[in-house]
Regions:
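Short structured motifs
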Residues: 10-15, 212-213, 259-265, 279-280
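Long, acidic serine/threonine- and proline-rich intrinsically disordered regions
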Residues: 282-412
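Extracellular adhesion/glycan-binding regions together with long Ser/Thr-
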Residues: 246-272
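Exposed acidic/Ser/Thr-rich ligand/metal-binding surfaces
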Residues: 2, 7-225, 286-287, 369-372
Length: 412
């Protein structure tokens, strides 16, 4: 039935100049559940996979245990939950079950002690097994994966397990606590599974709020298996696609082909848009109104037993010889483009720094102006050949991918 999701777009310029050459056009596409879905609450099939190695000793483990108990308290009886711990072995301390015996579950959490090394794949295997134990109709299947260290010799196995999770409809949401975890691996695990890049828990005391956000994200899921397609007419090609909300993520070349762009969006959460910025190249056109793309969103509404629902929208621009008309730009779209570019360049600086201990990429003032003072100062240190901490590296990456969550600096 219609009305569960809105599909909207904005273009960088509604009026483009008639020229003799090809031109770049930005299209910002947004998908969002409607108010019709505001009261939807699908059951959760949740596993928390927790590193309890020796390096978790003290405040980190203490705060994580309190955060896990908070999650248990907030689950509904229709939710299933399990908890797996790992060091260089793994153990299921709460097998997957309905969230009924909360005192018993929390007592089991209190018994977790720090010990051993870090072999993350063992925890992931047990976690996936727990999620597969039950067939729960319409459930949101999700793994929260927390670690504070570098896994030992099993990174490729972790990546393959993330692919296996995606095939089973299980999204992994990694959390890194402290400064010593492998952000490249955790980001990849999250993205390969259809989840998110790693969230950085900078201070142990932040664990409670981060776990609360993760739980709320799962509770808010209303639409599943969402895919955005842009179909392009002759004379229009796609150069780049970047997810810009809820975070910035370069989608790479795999989503692009000659005549269409196919972008898996996964779950849509209530009141939270997912937005994609697509850069198109348009061949010369005479004056007039032209369609430069057709957008299509396919999605499932599990609560209504609907699969493969579709909505479409035409993206049009006017080519004009009026210089005043073609000079106008959409500030909102260009703000997203500016921040996506800032994320790309900062990511390049961090990659260079992690690889060589220095960076040759320099950021222009129009890039640095959208960054906070801490990030600017750390990047300046890198440019001057100085070292920054692993904590700063993780903080910069985490904050830069969230630049678009703050759009109050739009220039009209």
């Amino acid at each position: 039935m219609p009305g569960e999701v809105t599909l909207a777009h904005e273009v960088g310029k509604d009026f483009m100049p008639v020229t003799g050459g090809s031109q770049v056009a930005y299209v910002l596409v947004e998908a969002r559940p409607t108010e019709m879905m505001a009261q939807v609450r699908m059951p959760l099939n949740f596993v928390l996979v927790l590193d309890h190695s020796g390096s978790m000793k003290g405040a980190k483990l203490k705060n994580v245990k309190e955060a896990v108990k908070m999650v248990i308290d907030r689950l509904e009886p229709t939710d299933y939950v399990s908890v797996v711990i790992f060091d260089d072995t793994s153990q299921v301390i709460i097998p997957s079950m309905p969230a009924n015996d909360k005192p018993g579950m929390k007592a089991a959490i209190d018994q977790i002690r720090d010990a051993g090394g870090t072999t993350m794949s063992l925890g992931m295997i047990q976690g996936l097994n727990e999620l597969r134990r039950w067939h729960i109709p319409n459930a949101v299947n999700r793994m929260i994966l927390l670690t504070d260290g570098v896994t030992y010799g099993d990174s490729d196995r972790c990546r393959q397990l993330a692919r296996d999770a995606a095939s089973a409809g299980i999204a992994i949401y990694p959390l890194g606590i402290g400064a010593d975890w492998d952000e490249d691996l955790l980001d990849t695990v999250g993205q390969l599974s259809g989840g998110m890049p790693a969230e950085f828990i900078r201070n142990a005391t932040d664990a409670l709020s981060i776990f609360e956000q993760q739980l709320q994200s799962a509770v808010d899921v209303a639409i599943r298996n969402t895919t955005l397609i842009l179909r392009l007419p002759v004379g229009v090609s796609a150069k780049k696609a970047v997810k810009v909300l809820p975070i910035i993520s370069d989608l790479g070349q795999s989503v692009l082909s000659d005549r269409q762009v196919v972008i898996p969006l996964g779950d849509l959460e209530k009141d939270k848009p997912q937005s994609v910025l697509v850069e198109l190249m348009i061949d010369p056109r005479p004056a007039g109104l032209f369609r430069i793309a057709q957008t299509e969103l396919s999605y499932d509404v599990p609560i209504a037993n609907l699969e493969g629902e579709k909505i479409r929208d035409d993206v049009k621009v006017t080519f004009t010889t009026d210089a005043n008309q073609s000079a106008a730009v959409n500030a909102n779209v260009m703000n997203f483009a500016e921040k996506a570019n800032a994320h790309r360049l900062v990511t390049r600086v961090l990659e260079e720094y992690k690889r060589t201990g220095k960076a040759t990429t320099r950021l222009a003032p129009n890039v640095t102006r959208v960054l906070d003072e801490e990030t600017q100062a750390a990047l300046e240190q890198i440019n001057q050949g100085q070292q920054i901490s692993q904590e700063q590296v993780k903080s910069i990456g985490n904050k830069t991918r969230k630049l678009t969550q703050r759009l109050d600096d739009v220039v009209p």
